[in-house]
Amino acid sequence: MNLRPLHDRVIVKRLDQETKTASGIVIPDAAAEKPDQGEVLAVGPGKRDDKGAPIALDVKVGDRVLFGKYAGQTVKVDGNELLVMREEDIMAVVNK
Protein backbone atom coordinates (compact mmCIF):
# COMPACT_ATOMS: atom_id res chain seq x y z
CA MET A 1 0.00 0.00 0.00
CA ASN A 2 1.44 3.35 -1.01
CA LEU A 3 -0.63 5.65 1.21
CA ARG A 4 0.84 7.79 3.97
CA PRO A 5 -1.88 9.55 5.97
CA LEU A 6 -1.29 13.12 7.05
CA HIS A 7 -1.81 14.74 10.45
CA ASP A 8 -4.27 12.76 12.63
CA ARG A 9 -5.68 10.64 9.83
CA VAL A 10 -5.79 6.85 9.93
CA ILE A 11 -6.15 4.29 7.11
CA VAL A 12 -8.51 1.45 8.06
CA LYS A 13 -9.54 -1.71 6.23
CA ARG A 14 -13.04 -2.88 7.11
CA LEU A 15 -13.20 -6.38 8.56
CA ASP A 16 -15.57 -8.85 6.96
CA GLN A 17 -18.84 -9.20 8.79
CA GLU A 18 -20.47 -12.51 9.58
CA THR A 19 -22.87 -13.57 6.82
CA LYS A 20 -24.70 -15.98 9.14
CA THR A 21 -26.60 -15.22 12.33
CA ALA A 22 -26.13 -17.23 15.52
CA SER A 23 -29.26 -19.22 14.66
CA GLY A 24 -27.89 -20.14 11.22
CA ILE A 25 -29.81 -17.69 9.02
CA VAL A 26 -27.73 -16.55 6.04
CA ILE A 27 -27.74 -12.78 5.48
CA PRO A 28 -27.59 -11.82 1.78
CA ASP A 29 -25.03 -9.19 0.72
CA ALA A 30 -27.77 -6.74 -0.26
CA ALA A 31 -29.26 -6.81 3.27
CA ALA A 32 -26.00 -6.76 5.19
CA GLU A 33 -24.86 -3.49 6.75
CA LYS A 34 -21.33 -2.20 6.36
CA PRO A 35 -19.10 -3.54 9.12
CA ASP A 36 -18.23 -1.06 11.86
CA GLN A 37 -14.93 -2.72 12.74
CA GLY A 38 -11.64 -2.54 10.95
CA GLU A 39 -7.90 -2.98 11.15
CA VAL A 40 -5.59 0.03 11.19
CA LEU A 41 -3.18 -0.18 8.24
CA ALA A 42 -1.40 3.18 8.61
CA VAL A 43 -1.41 6.21 10.90
CA GLY A 44 -0.33 9.80 10.37
CA PRO A 45 2.20 11.62 12.56
CA GLY A 46 -0.54 13.33 14.60
CA LYS A 47 -1.82 16.86 15.12
CA ARG A 48 0.50 19.59 16.33
CA ASP A 49 0.20 21.41 19.63
CA ASP A 50 0.50 25.19 20.10
CA LYS A 51 4.30 24.99 20.01
CA GLY A 52 4.35 22.91 16.82
CA ALA A 53 5.29 19.61 18.44
CA PRO A 54 3.43 16.55 17.11
CA ILE A 55 0.86 14.90 19.38
CA ALA A 56 1.10 11.13 18.88
CA LEU A 57 -2.03 9.15 18.02
CA ASP A 58 -3.54 6.63 20.46
CA VAL A 59 -4.06 3.99 17.76
CA LYS A 60 -1.27 2.09 16.02
CA VAL A 61 -0.90 -0.14 12.98
CA GLY A 62 -2.55 -3.52 13.55
CA ASP A 63 -5.15 -2.27 16.08
CA ARG A 64 -8.71 -3.52 15.64
CA VAL A 65 -11.00 -0.50 15.98
CA LEU A 66 -14.69 0.38 16.18
CA PHE A 67 -16.04 3.33 14.22
CA GLY A 68 -19.37 4.82 13.17
CA LYS A 69 -21.29 3.49 10.20
CA TYR A 70 -20.67 6.65 8.17
CA ALA A 71 -17.17 7.47 9.47
CA GLY A 72 -14.35 8.29 7.10
CA GLN A 73 -13.96 8.62 3.37
CA THR A 74 -13.91 5.47 1.22
CA VAL A 75 -11.02 5.18 -1.24
CA LYS A 76 -9.91 2.37 -3.56
CA VAL A 77 -6.22 1.52 -3.65
CA ASP A 78 -4.89 -1.42 -5.67
CA GLY A 79 -8.43 -2.84 -5.85
CA ASN A 80 -8.91 -2.71 -2.07
CA GLU A 81 -11.58 -0.55 -0.47
CA LEU A 82 -10.10 1.41 2.42
CA LEU A 83 -11.31 4.13 4.78
CA VAL A 84 -9.42 7.33 5.52
CA MET A 85 -10.67 8.84 8.78
CA ARG A 86 -9.58 11.14 11.55
CA GLU A 87 -8.56 9.55 14.82
CA GLU A 88 -11.53 11.26 16.52
CA ASP A 89 -13.90 9.18 14.31
CA ILE A 90 -12.62 6.01 16.01
CA MET A 91 -14.76 5.14 19.02
CA ALA A 92 -12.71 2.34 20.60
CA VAL A 93 -9.86 -0.12 20.21
CA VAL A 94 -10.89 -3.78 20.55
CA ASN A 95 -8.58 -5.65 22.94
CA LYS A 96 -7.66 -9.10 21.69
Curated annotation (Swiss-Prot):
It holds the Pfam family Cpn10. InterPro entries: Chaperonin_GroES, Chaperonin_GroES_sf, Chaprnonin_Cpn10_CS, GroES-like_sf. Gene3D superfamilies: GroES chaperonin. Keywords: Chaperone, Cytoplasm. GO terms for cellular component: cytoplasm. GO terms for biological process: chaperone cofactor-dependent protein refolding. Its main location: cytoplasm. PROSITE patterns: CHAPERONINS_CPN10. GO terms for molecular function: ATP binding; metal ion binding; protein folding chaperone; protein-folding chaperone binding; unfolded protein binding. It is found in: Cytoplasm. PANTHER family: 10 KDA HEAT SHOCK PROTEIN (PTHR10772), CO-CHAPERONIN GROES (PTHR10772:SF58). Belongs to the GroES chaperonin family. Together with the chaperonin GroEL, plays an essential role in assisting protein folding. The GroEL-GroES system forms a nano-cage that allows encapsulation of the non-native substrate proteins and provides a physical environment optimized to promote and accelerate protein folding. GroES binds to the apical surface of the GroEL ring, thereby capping the opening of the GroEL channel. Heptamer of 7 subunits arranged in a ring. Interacts with the chaperonin GroEL. This is Co-chaperonin GroES. It comes from Paraburkholderia phymatum (strain DSM 17167 / CIP 108236 / LMG 21445 / STM815) (Burkholderia phymatum). The lineage of its organism: Bacteria, Pseudomonadati, Pseudomonadota, Betaproteobacteria, Burkholderiales.
